[in-house]
Amino acid sequence: MDPAGFCCQTRLVIVAGKGGVGKTTVTAALARMAAGAGLSTLIVEVEGKSGLASTFDAGELTYQETVLHPGGAGAAEVRARTLTPDDALLEYLVDHGLRRISKRLVRSGALDVVATAAPGIRDILVLGKVKQLERAGVADHPGTVL
């Protein structure tokens, strides 16, 4: 199997499954394979509770991108970040000119109420942000979501 060819088949890979089935291990392996093939990789962690950073000997992930593996010698870098529905909603509001509303939601504690107002809204917020990252070219082959 040609790793570069495999990784170039899609711009986005979603790794999903029940707890304890190896999602973190598969994600790390895919990211390392893509980086080894020279493809810059962004891992987006959505559950916020995996040991992904430790597989790269890195600190805890945050909403801001962190370089997990710097690349070099023909390999590209592996970056990672967490993504929460609350952060995705706040960023969406700010990006659409609603910074004052986003600040009020945070101050009042109503952010969680808004982010969970309808069934499935948390998933929509996260997937919408992942789609935005992929379209912006930030999530290069493969942007992996746990």
Predicted regions and their residues:
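Flexible phosphate-sensing "switch/lid" loops adjacent to ATP/NTP-binding sites
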Residues: 1-14, 21, 26-146
